[in-house]
């Protein structure tokens, strides 16, 4: 629908959805100090961009830290009507990812670990059962049965921060993985020419893929190529936003990174 004002013509659309938001408007969702007041400020900033629904994203840290962050988010969601409206659930990115340089990205290596199903379900309890999306590396020990378990419970499994072979990626997809997280990022700048995890994921028809389309994480020509290969029905655009998004230049924290 087109809406006209005196100065401009606007298009009225449905609210946008973002599957990966680590923080926004000066507020870090990975901080154990999150309060309802801070979250309300962040939600209003997110809403002003046209995003109506999103998944707060918690990255690799100690189990204690992860439980605090998830329980704080869940408490705030219950306290704030706007949070209950906008937060569809939570995205757990890590800690079951690759430790290899480049593939680990900004995740603290000391807290990256093998799959621990009992640990995950303790985190799920802290989150009130609302972890809806888990990003993991399928080559990590224990990943394949974990993918089957999560898929069976209706939790979406995404592949990310991975150096898996094409065979392992295929096995992960057949076990229930549905998505590639920020494909083209969280990887090494030095990959094999043909058999590498980016090409392997692009070639899997059952995998959708999310991309950070800011012209910084992926050059426009690279993103254009990825989109052509995947096709628009298998593409999800995300921000992977942090606390520094939408604020003035300065010093901000994302987890333990400043």
What are the roles of these predicted feature ranges?
Residues 15-17, 158, 179, 237-238:
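Residue-level marker for buried hydrophobic side chains located in beta-strands
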Residues 35-37, 116, 254-258:
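Gly/Ser/Thr-rich active-site loops/lids in small-molecule metabolic enzymes
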